[in-house]
Amino acid sequence: MKNLLKNQIESHIEFSEWYRKIVNDFSFDLQKDREARDVLSRILEKKQYSYNLEEILLSFKENFQKKEHICVFGCGPSLEESVDFILSNLGKNFFNNCVNLAADGAAQLLNERIIPIDGIITDLDGITKRDFLKAKYVIVHAHGDNIILLEHFKNTIINFTKIIGTTQAESTQYLINPGGFTDGDRILTFIVSFLLPQQELYLIGMDFNDIVGKYSKPNNEKNYLADPIKLKKLQYALQIIEWLIPKIKIPLYLINTKKISDKFNYLTLEAFKERF
């Protein structure tokens, strides 16, 4: 049974070709990715109890499969309007009855609205330690540009029980490589092998346009225009999710966003409300 779920997640999709393309396109340093992986791995080794990745993955899977509706929250400009509309029309119990997964800074809004967070998927640049501690599970990603943040969150990571480390380099005993590039699409590559036929996926605040939502970074007061690098990252995220569609095999809906691809189902906020 050792590493059964780790192997399941890592083998469910073949992401290496995507990774090579991304590294070449952005001129990323492979060695820095490995260095970040090793930093996070050493931090996880310092946990005072015996850290068992497989047990935490099993716990996450069991929690994830208890509910029919899965809400994945991105940091796009439609996030706040969408969440507030759902709260006003369907009430907080709607979110209480969903699996709520936040891409990085989207956790800020969910915490402000006192919405339970089942998991944050984060490279740590969009959340505070307070956001970190409010989630049931935290999936921390190590890459070449966040080594300083890994050190900043070191004690928080050590003291947090239900934590899963991810890397885009070769995996280790303590870290998993689920594929994915941005926090938003990495949520889907991470959960795709856990999905059940009766479940449905709702992507909220995932707009993939040239406006970046204010919740993408702590202390932002308003949305802002994406720079060329950010825009290219969002386009990759969109392409990766499109590529995942045949592997997801359950209904997936983008909520309250403009049509960006023929491969997705779209729901206005009113249409979303009518489903429930």
Regions found by a protein language model. Name each.
Residues 87-88, 147-150, 184-185, 228-239:
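Well-ordered, non-membrane alpha-helical segments in soluble/globular domains
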Residues 74, 81-86, 111-114, 214-215:
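Short, glycine/acidic-enriched capping/hinge loops at junctions between secondary-structure elements
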Residues 1-70, 75-84, 220-223, 234-276:
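N-terminal donor/sugar-recognition subdomains of glycan-related enzymes
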Residues 70-71, 92-100:
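Short beta-strand/loop segments at the ligand-binding rim of alpha/beta enzyme cores
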Residues 72-77, 183-184, 198-215, 229, ...:
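Glycine-rich anion-binding loop/nest that anchors nucleotide
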Residues 215-227:
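A solvent-exposed, charged loop/short amphipathic helix patch at secondary-structure junctions
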Residues 85-94, 115-117, 154-157, 218-221, ...:
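Short, solvent-exposed amphipathic alpha-helical segments in soluble enzyme
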Residues 62-67, 98-99, 105-198:
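Acidic/Gly/His-enriched mid-domain segments of enzyme catalytic cores or analogous surface patches
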